[in-house]
Amino acid sequence: MRSAEKAVPLTSAYSVVCLLPQAQFNNFRSCAQGNVFHSLLCLGAQRKGMVISMLNNKGFDLWADGYDKTVGISDEENTYPFAGYKKVLGLIFQTIMGVENAVVLDIGFGTGTLTTKLYERGCSIYGQDFSSRMIALASEKMPNAQLYQGDFSKGLVEPLRSFRYDYIVATYSLHHLTDAQKKSFLSDLRGYLKENGKIIIGDVAFETREALEQCKWKAGDAWDPDEIYFVVEELRKDFPALSFTQMSDCAGVLMLG
């Protein structure tokens, strides 16, 4: 074990696990199937002699109340997977604010951290998320937003297909899709953009495969092998106009018109 390199992510992961009350943690374990926090939780759980697999939608529901705090820990410590999270959201927010009263679709909006700020500034918000609990939390902040539950690996839910959007955003959500699914979904989403509209993705993302491998090595056991992160040079083969801004060593913003 590389003590210096693994101590920080292991400590971070353990602190994340400790945020969850024991009763919820036990429920969490019983329904675990798939989540962006998988590697963090597994590391922390190993210290307790526990095993956690990926979360299903029930797992997302259980984790919803601690979502923002969990992300904040990783961002503040500048560690994978959420290093640069605030910078990512800040760039997306500034971009969308360039269009007055923009119509925005958020794919996997979570607790509404980004979309709430847009909503408060006059944007019309539409969204799709896997978790009913996430939707409930976001709806409290945005009572007039049009939010729907659905698995975006199967595409947009029917009500959202009736509209056209200035911006379609996805923050830390599309890495659950395979590369082939990403390409298909992005191609489909372009059909729902208004003229001059943009798809904006903020996520764990890298310009090259080499950069991804470097981040993977640095993250050590914290790296989640079940997530499929963006490699821009490979995605540009299908989307030559794709632009990319690196925001940290593991996060970036992709834009596609």
Region annotations inferred by a language model:
Residues 101-108:
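Conserved class I S-adenosyl-L-methionine
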Residues 169:
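A conserved beta-strand element that flanks and buttresses the S-adenosyl-L-methionine
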